[in-house]
């Protein structure tokens, strides 16, 4: 029993990543916290709901690039709280993106 506990502790210590895990969102595009999900949406309903929201086809370098990626497919660049089933709850325009 003691051997198992010590072996599990040792295995857990070995399994910890040695380098920092990179964030999937660019902090320059969307703020960290609630509005951290990047989506391209057809319609933004008063910032409460974004319709037909999909993830961008590529990782944006900055806010302008994010806007260009979404514009290619005829959508608007938005930062959302909860994207579910092509709908995103609570959306806002990223800083540096024009309407």
From Swiss-Prot:
Disulfide bonds: 30-79, 40-70
Localization annotation: Secreted; Secreted, Cell wall; Vacuole; Cytoplasmic vesicle
Annotated keywords: Cell wall, Cytoplasmic vesicle, Disulfide bond, Secreted, Signal, Vacuole
UniProt keyword Disulfide bond present: yes
Coiled-coil region: none
Induction / repression: Under normal conditions on SDAY medium (Sabouraud dextrose agar plus 1% yeast extract), the expression of hyd2B is increasingly down-regulated to a hardly detectable level on day 6. Hyd1A is the most active at transcription level under normal culture conditions, followed by hyd1B, hyd1E, hyd2A and hyd2C in order.
InterPro entries noted in UniProt: Cerato-ulmin_hydrophobin (IPR010636), Hydrophobin_sf (IPR036686)
Signal sequence bounds: 1-15
Main location: secreted
GO cellular component: extracellular region
Disruption phenotype: Does not affect radial growth and multiple stress responses.
Family: Belongs to the cerato-ulmin hydrophobin family.
Function: Aerial growth, conidiation, and dispersal of filamentous fungi in the environment rely upon a capability of their secreting small amphipathic proteins called hydrophobins (HPBs) with low sequence identity. Class I can self-assemble into an outermost layer of rodlet bundles on aerial cell surfaces, conferring cellular hydrophobicity that supports fungal growth, development and dispersal; whereas Class II form highly ordered films at water-air interfaces through intermolecular interactions but contribute nothing to the rodlet structure.
PANTHER family cross-referenced by the UniProt entry: HYDROPHOBIN
This protein's name: Class II hydrophobin B
Species whose genome carries this gene: Beauveria bassiana (strain ARSEF 2860)
């Amino acid at each position: 029993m003691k051997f198992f506990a010590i072996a599990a502790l040792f295995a857990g210590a070995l399994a910890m990543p040695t380098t920092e895990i990179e964030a999937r969102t660019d902090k320059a595009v969307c703020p960290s916290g609630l509005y951290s999900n990047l989506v391209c949406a057809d319609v933004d309903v008063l910032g409460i709901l974004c319709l037909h929201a999909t993830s961008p086809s590529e990782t944006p370098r900055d806010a302008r690039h994010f806007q260009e990626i979404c514009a290619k497919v005829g959508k608007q660049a938005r930062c959302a709280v909860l994207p579910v089933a092509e709908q995103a709850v609570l959306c806002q325009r990223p800083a540096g993106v024009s309407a």
